[in-house]
Structure formats: structure tokens, C-alpha cells
Amino acid sequence: MDQKTLEKFQNALSNHRDILLQWLNEDSASKDIPFGGKSVNEVDHILSDLKNALTRIDEGTFGNCEMCGGEIEKERLELDYTTHVCLDHYTSEQIRALETDLELARRVQKQLLPCCLPELPNIEIAVHAASARIVGGDYYDFFTSKDGHQGFVIADVMGKGLPASLLMSNLQASLRLLGPEYETPKQILARLDELFRNNLKLIRFISIFIGIIDTKNKILNYSNAGHHPPILWNNTKKKIRMLFPTEPAIGLTKDPDFQSKTIQMASGDILLLYTDGLIESRNSYGEEFGESRLVEFTIKHSNKDVTEFLDELRLTAEKHTREFQDDLSLMIIKIR
């Protein structure tokens, strides 16, 4: 396993451990409510598994099969960091159970994505979603805010397989319920954080970008909770602006102070939203697609309509990476 991948596992496991320890150290009254549906004893068991996995990283044995010493599939480690053996040593019953979970995850993910795009004055929208071999937690959707403006969201649930897909379904249901109840992204994020705080401590976290556009006045109001920064092309100034996170991802901090920002947009402006499946994809030399390549692409193709822009971006990404290891989700919004 390469060093960068190992560091990602180590950081994720450490964050997971720290959140559990924080909960265990809280006063006893707060533990009367099961933690993500788990009792204190169950959380202790999960914490022990996390510590063992981190120990294996320190010892240099994480990801190695205990039976043959070979490398365990990275995708399976993302599904379950406690995995000790490679697929070659799974029983036929274990393999069938794994395949059933993965197929169900694919079905859940497919059914969650919107069947059609909003038709709006002054706005063009195009989207693309492709699942990797091991289904992850990418999600995008649209909603109408309380004051009648167009809302949109792109998110990534950290994790793989059925747990990520099921959490994604909860996220969809919550957003479709909360979106019409509030006027700003920060209000929606605050409620989402309240709803997901306990469950997320066992699924790690959700990075999410929520935007609401006043299509008549071309005003964008947004909040970015730990998601990769969308790229905004300012057609008037011919400049790029990165919409960096306004707060951490949901589930990483206790009682975050969510913020919203407002941008006046104009005709020809483009907003590109994406998940890490794009920028972290690697070519045969191990080079990531990266944000800088994405910025260069946006500048070069800013004169295209959203469909042409999306098609060209997909082709460019596929030339760079033959097989994506993570889900790939893209959303392009252009002001007419």
C-alpha cells in the first residue's frame, strides 16, 4: 500500500477514534441516549477495533492478510478496516454475503439520485454520476427553499458500501424535508448536524456543499461544510474563485458555527461542483488529476454550454484515468 493511501486510512481511523473517545468522556447523562444506536459496551468494542487497526499501521502490517501475508484489497479495507484476510481466504458464504451487500448498495445509490434536472430561467444545469466498482457515498440533489429559490447540494459520505449508501438515503430524506423549511444553507446545515450528530460518530463524517440561487437576481448563497471547493468562473473579470469550506464537515466537531456566504453572479459565470473521485484519480504514473488541472480546464472551456463542458470534462478525466477507484459526481451550473 502506498504511503498516501496509508496516511488517509490513519487519519480517518484517528478521527473516528477521537470522536468516540470524546463521547465516552462526556457526562453519564448524555449516554442515556444510545450513541448512533450503540450502547457504551458496543462503542468500547468498536474503539478497541480502531486502536488495533492503528497499531497495525504503526507496525507496518495494516492491509496484510494474516493467512498468506499478501495485500488485502484496498476497497475492502474501506468497507471494513478490521478486515484481516484477503478474498482468497473468504468462505463461499462470506463472498456471497459481501456481493449481496454491494449490489444492494448500488441499487440504493441509483434510486437516490434525482430523475430529472430543474428547468430554470437564466440557469443551465448538467450533472454526471458514475459509481466505482465499490460503491461509495456520493450524492447530489435539488430542492426549492422556503422563499422559492433554487437549492442544490453535492455531498460525500465518508465510507463505502451499504453503510454509506444507507446513510446517504437518510441524508436525502432529511434534505428534502428541511430544504423547503429554511431560507439559507447555514440553517439547513445546522439542522442536519443536529439530526446526524450521533449516527455519524460511527460512520465518520459527511462533507457537503449547499447552495441556493436567486435566479431572478442571480445571487448565490452558499455554505461549504468540509467539501472540496467548487470552482467559480467569473466571466466578467475572467477570473477563478475557489469556494473554500466555511466550516468543517458534518460530524467532525461539536456544535459548529455554520456560516453562509453570498456572491453576485452574472451572465456567463460557471459553477463547477465535484467529488474527490475526480481530483484524486490517478494516471499510470501515479499522478492525481488534481485541482490545478481542473482550474485550467474550467478556464479553457468557459465559453461552452453546460452539456459541452460536461462531456469534455468527462473525456479529459477518462483519458487521465482508465478506471476510477472512487465514485465520480459532477455538477455544472451556468448563468445565462
Describe the predicted segments one by one.
Residues 1-59:
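Interaction interfaces in information-processing and related assembly proteins
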Residues 58-62, 82:
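Short metal-coordination and nucleic-acid-contact micro-motifs, chiefly zinc-binding Cys/His arrays
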Residues 72, 93:
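Cys/His-rich microdomains that often coordinate metals
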